Structure formats: C-alpha cells, structure tokens
C-alpha cells in the first residue's frame, strides 16, 4: 500500500494538520492491517525533517514523525518511510504561498546546486511504486531520505519525453 496524504503547513490549522498527518494515517493503517495479508507492506509519504522522537518544535516534523513511529509499531511486515525535501510539481498549479512560488521559480538552479534537497513529483512517485513492487523479501522498516529517493530513481531506466 502506498499512502500519500498531507496538507500545506499554514493552509490548515494546527489541529487540522495533526488530524490529516497523524489521525487519518493511523486509522487507515489500522484498517488496512486488520484486512490485509500479514505480509502487507506500507509505504508512507512522510517528509524531510520528520521527527519520530516528538521533540521538534515544527508541527509538520513532529506530526509526520509521530505517524512514522506509529506505522513502525503497527505490525506490518515492511514499512517504507519516504522523506522527500522540496517536491517539484511537474504539472501547473496555483502555488499556495510565496515560498512555494519562489521555489518553483528557482528550482532549475536549486536542482543543480542542491540536488539532494529537491525531487520531482513524478520521480518520487516512481521511487515509491518501485519500492512497493520490488522489495518483497525484506522485513522491517526502512527510511528513504531525499538522496536515497534520488538514487532509487537514478537506478531506473529513464523516462522518455520528460521536461526539466
């Protein structure tokens, strides 16, 4: 199972951010665990800076970390935690705030200068699907930081007709 649900920090209240980041994730995992094979895997879109210790002052990091910790304790045979940094949207969209508009504008330079701090949305999706399909024999939890996600993508054959 691949689970990707979240909200922009600042777009919702702190309580809503926790509900979306933790409560929905945990409830979905609980239902999935009860109704799926004992060998089921759970791939979770977390985020750069997620803090499973709960000590972060940043709500996003604290909540994603809490969800990660709960998933690792939920009894799945395999849990894959993906922690991308800035996710570059490959489709046009209305950016939610100035910082997202700025990142979109400087992405080409940022990608060259700090490649381990950015990932294209389609590359992230490819990596998550690849891990979910191919990592069937491994047990336990595994964290994929942004550089690990990029390495997974670079190990795959290139996609055709792709911009940026």
List each model region and its residues.
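Residue-level signal for alpha-helix termini/capping positions
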Residues: 33-37, 133
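A short helix->loop->beta-strand "cap" motif at the edges of active sites that frequently abuts
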Residues: 36-40, 76
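SDR active-site strand-loop-helix element
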Residues: 4-5, 42-48, 82-84
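NAD(P)H-binding glycine-rich loop region in Rossmannoid oxidoreductase-like domains
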Residues: 1-27, 31-34
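Oxidoreductase cofactor-interface core, primarily capturing Rossmann-like NAD(P)-dependent enzymes
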Residues: 52-159
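C-terminal accessory extensions appended to soluble enzyme cores
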Residues: 160-164
């Amino acid at each position: 199972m691949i689970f990707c649900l979240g909200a922009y920090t600042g777009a919702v209240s702190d309580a809503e951010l926790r509900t979306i980041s933790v409560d929905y994730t945990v409830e979905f995992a609980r239902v999935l665990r009860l109704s799926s094979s004992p060998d089921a895997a759970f791939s979770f879109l977390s985020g750069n800076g997620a803090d499973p210790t709960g000590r972060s002052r940043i709500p996003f990091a604290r909540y994603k970390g809490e969800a990660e910790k709960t998933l690792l304790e939920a009894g799945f045979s395999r849990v894959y935690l993906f922690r991308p940094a800035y996710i570059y949207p490959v489709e046009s969209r209305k950016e939610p705030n100035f910082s997202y508009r700025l990142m979109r504008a400087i992405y080409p330079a940022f990608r060259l200068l700090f490649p381990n701090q950015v990932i294209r949305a389609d590359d992230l999706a490819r990596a998550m699907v690849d891990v979910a399909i191919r990592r069937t024999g491994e047990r336990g939890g595994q964290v994929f930081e942004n550089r690990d996600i990029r390495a997974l993508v670079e190990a795959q054959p290139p996609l055709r007709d792709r911009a940026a």
